[in-house]
A protein has these predicted regions:
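Short alpha-helical linear motifs
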Residues: 110, 126-129, 164-168, 183-186
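Short linear functional motifs in flexible/disordered or boundary regions
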Residues: 62, 98, 122, 138, ...
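Intrinsic-disorder/low-complexity, polar/charged segments enriched in Ser/Thr/Lys/Arg/Asp/Glu/Gln
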Residues: 33-37, 41, 121-123, 140, ...
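Hot-dog-fold acyl-thioester-processing enzymes
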Residues: 2-7, 11-104, 168-191, 198-205
Length: 205
């Protein structure tokens, strides 16, 4: 279901808004706080999956017994795992229905301030730092982001996150007011079926 309907009488095939309109929507929010995002649980399974994907199997992330004698006393998530949550968490802070493609472009002024214990919950706060229309149909949006751990006073990390967006052909102006908690991009799709094995005679020259 779309976030906002097209204006009545909109010509078929014409966008309800332009990229400049979307840029203006963000420009009016420069300096304003967005959020917080919904809470997100940092599960042991997710941390283990990240460890396997990045080959970072340090005991402070995976071994509760050894982590107990380490600097944090409990297993903690990888710093880059927490960074990897930023696009997902910040995508809940504004209406994403106009977005076709979202690209991570830059991370600046990244600071890891406190550890994120495995099993804790995190959420994001952000402020719009800047916005501009770039060549080839991209909108650049810079968010100053703080990732917060439930129960902690200090952010786990802070950073400036720059993303490039392209606009859907049928986009409408982002909705104002409370933001529906809808994730962009959509949830993980079901695994694709395995390809059929090639005939044996096709494998020989």
């Amino acid at each position: 279901m779309p976030w906002a309907s097209e204006p009545a009488g909109q010509p078929t095939g014409q966008p309800a808004v332009t990229l400049d309109d979307i840029a203006e929507w963000f420009t009016r929010r420069v300096g304003r706080e967005l959020g917080p995002s919904p809470w997100h649980e940092v599960t042991p399974e997710a941390v283990r999956g990240f460890a396997d994907a990045t080959h970072d199997w340090q005991a402070i992330h995976l071994d509760a017994e050894r982590a107990a004698s380490g600097p944090y006393g409990v297993p903690v998530a990888h710093g880059f795992y927490t960074l990897g949550l930023i696009p997902y968490l910040t995508s809940t802070l504004f209406d994403p229905s106009w977005i076709d493609v979202a690209l991570n472009y830059r991370l600046d002024r990244v600071r890891f301030l406190t550890a994120v214990p495995v099993g804790s919950r995190v959420r994001a706060l952000a402020r719009v730092r800047g916005v501009r229309v770039r060549p080839r149909g991209y909108l650049e949006v810079v968010l100053a982001v703080s990732l917060m751990v439930e129960g902690a006073e200090q952010p786990a990390c802070t950073l400036d996150h720059t993303r490039l967006y392209t606009m859907r052909p049928d986009a409408s102006r982002p909705v104002d007011g409370p933001v529906p908690r809808v994730m962009y991009p959509p949830e993980r799709p079901a695994p694709a079926p395995a390809p059929a094995p090639a005939p044996a005679d096709s494998l020989t020259p």
